[in-house]
Regions:
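Non-catalytic terminal extensions of PLP-dependent enzymes
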Residues: 35-196
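Glycine-rich phosphate-binding loop plus the immediately following alpha-helix
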Residues: 19
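Conserved core segment of the aminotransferase class I/II
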Residues: 1-14, 22-34, 39, 118-127
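A short, ordered amphipathic alpha-helix with a cationic face
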Residues: 12, 16, 133-134
Length: 196
């Protein structure tokens, strides 16, 4: 009788056994493989950061925003400004998690796109989604947020980097052929997005 009462307390009068079975399977998979899935997710985001930070053409138009860019120093006791520095390599994220009041989610990459002359929403909609089929969930005035997940593959990261390089090459060609007035207009748009 006690078991029946406890069981009825935690169940429904119309349970959906397919959903319950799916939740049980998902819980078991996370228990067995969750750490590896999340580790690969973070590695995908870190490789994205490294690829953008070390590619000379991408540096010209894009910047991965770091803890130092987004979190005031008084909230970063560890003193770590970036998870990845091209000169020094990787920093110990665990130190940030242990000491800092605020940290960035290592699985998300905030990319400043104002250097392209496009605002975040235009870059998301007209460039990434319409032209290349890349889905972005969050934007700001001059940034887009890439969110990796446990399904993010190396090939999807490579495709994104390839697309960013192609966009940068097209901008280079456009600016090479631009008149002085067109270049000034581009520079004003960039300044408006990045400095004002």
């Amino acid at each position: 009788q006690a078991f029946r009462e406890a069981y009825m307390t935690h169940t429904s009068t119309s349970p959906n056994y397919q959903i319950i079975a799916s939740l049980d399977v998902g819980r078991r998979q996370v228990e067995l493989e969750g750490f590896e899935f999340v580790q690969r997710q973070v590695e995908a985001a870190m490789s994205m950061r490294r690829a953008i930070a070390t590619h000379p053409l991408l540096q010209k138009y894009f910047k991965v925003l770091t803890s130092g860019d987004m979190i005031p120093e008084e909230h970063r006791e560890s003193g770590i400004k970036s998870y990845y520095n091209p000169d020094q390599g990787w920093n110990d994220i665990w130190e940030c998690w242990a000491k800092d009041e605020f940290v960035l989610d290592a699985s998300r990459v905030t990319l400043a796109v104002g250097g392209t002359g496009w605002d975040g929403d235009t870059f998301k909609t007209k460039i990434l989604m319409d032209k290349y089929g890349i889905q972005i969930n969050k934007t700001s005035r001059n940034t887009v947020l890439f969110m990796t997940n446990i399904g993010t593959t190396r090939s999807s990261v490579a495709y994104l980097i390839e697309v960013l390089v192609q966009i940068a090459q097209e901008l280079d060609e456009l600016l090479d052929d631009a008149s002085k007035m067109e270049r000034l207009s581009f520079e004003r748009r960039v300044k408006n997005l990045m400095e004002d």
